[in-house]
Swiss-Prot record:
Domain of life: Eukaryota
Signal peptide: none
Taxonomic source organism: Arabidopsis thaliana (Mouse-ear cress)
Membrane-spanning ranges: none
Phylogenetic placement of the source organism: Eukaryota, Viridiplantae, Streptophyta, Embryophyta, Tracheophyta
Family annotation (Pfam families): FBA_1 (PF07734)
Protein name per its UniProtKB record: Probable F-box protein At1g67455
Domain F-box per the UniProt entry, residue ranges: 1-46
């Protein structure tokens, strides 16, 4: 019997018990797209990274103790990554086990790709200057070659999605998703959404609606998402027991219908709000000073064997959002090249 003949859950349990050194020569693309997945462990805890005081920190939440009637949850474990102590980071983004980070220095802004599981770091050299307000993300073309895209926010299955609110800010369509095809280097059709805020959770897209007037929050998840179609169902609806200045990233436990929302509030600081169908379960102080009108940079993480070849040129599709009179905006694009460098 071949290992490929075993049930997927059993294979994942085996892989979770094998060291990365032993797995280094193997490719499990058909099974897990080169990701080392531990679903049983993932259901019990959230692993991710965040920016705390301009430093990269690992973060882990234990979800096992969250109960509706007896609220017990282990405090999050937040640890600063020592190898980046000398760098101030402003952005962090995850795609298939790779972290894309942007340094905070105005005069010497850099992009770095890091695989925490393999411990490898690649710096990205740009032929032109970076802009501090630009946003960057990772995706893949048909050959699974890493690509870069500016201003997009979410990646799923190696495809990047960005949220578009309409022709005028606060007016026009209620919102849609735009999919960027890294193979053709162009956008696909608009995917309609009923809400204004969208975030990513692992292999599904989760959409969050914050109804300020009704103090209500809804979370919907995709049942099917492709570059040209999206189907969603409601996961939970919660009537908020707190007010928020700016809601940022979040992750969900679909089985228990819980959500952990990272909230940046000038009155409460940066917190993780744990909510369920019955209401607010707990609020955890993350010990990070809140920045007005800024999301707390947090991303989930799943380990991977993905690597980037040294000296590989990556096409950079730049999107620069320009605000004009009457709150209209346009998006201009440009094409440049990135050259990766190991070390």
């Amino acid at each position: 019997m071949m290992i490929s003949d075993l049930p997927e859950d059993m294979v994942e349990e085996i892989l979770s018990r094998v060291s990365i050194i032993s797995l280094g020569a193997l490719r499990w693309n058909d099974l897990s797209k080169a990701r080392v997945i531990c679903k049983a462990e993932a259901r019990q805890q959230f692993a991710g990274f965040m920016i705390k005081g301009s430093k990269v920190c690992s973060m882990r939440f234990d979800l096992h103790g969250i109960q509706n009637n007896n609220v017990e949850v282990v405090e999050p474990s937040i640890k600063q990554i020592a190898k980046f102590n000398h760098v101030e980071i402003s952005q962090v983004f995850h795609c298939d086990g790779l972290l894309l980070m942007m340094s905070k220095e105005v005069s010497n802004t850099r992009l770095v790709v890091w695989n925490p599981y393999l411990g490898k770091i690649w710096s990205i050299q740009h032929r032109s200057a970076y802009h501090s307000e630009n946003r960057y993300t990772l995706g893949y073309d048909n050959n699974r070659k890493p690509q870069n895209l500016e201003v997009a926010y979410h990646s799923i299955k190696g495809i990047t999605y960005l949220f578009n609110g309409g022709e005028k800010i606060g007016e026009g369509p209620t919102g849609c998703l735009l999919c960027f095809d890294f193979t053709r280097e162009r956008f696909g059709p608009s995917l309609p959404l009923p809400f204004h805020v969208a975030h990513l959770y692992t292999e599904q897209l989760a959409v969050l609606l914050h109804n300020w007037g009704a103090f209500a929050m809804e979370i919907w998840v995709t049942t099917n998402i492709e570059p040209n179609a999206v189907l969603m169902e409601q996961l939970l609806k919660n009537y908020l027991l707190y007010t928020s200045d700016f809601i940022g990233s979040f992750f969900i436990d679909q089985e228990k219908k819980h959500a952990v929302i990272f909230d940046s509030s000038l009155s409460c600081g940066s917190v993780a709000c744990i909510i369920g169908e019955t209401g607010n379960l707990r609020t955890v102080d993350l010990g990070v000073a809140a920045v007005p009108y800024r999301q707390l940079p947090v991303c989930s993480y799943a380990p991977s064997l993905e690597q980037i070849n040294q000296g590989q040129e990556l096409p950079l599709i730049g999107l620069t959002q320009i605000f004009m009179e009457q709150h209209k905006y346009w998006v201009s694009t440009f094409l440049d090249n990135l050259i990766t460098k190991y070390g």
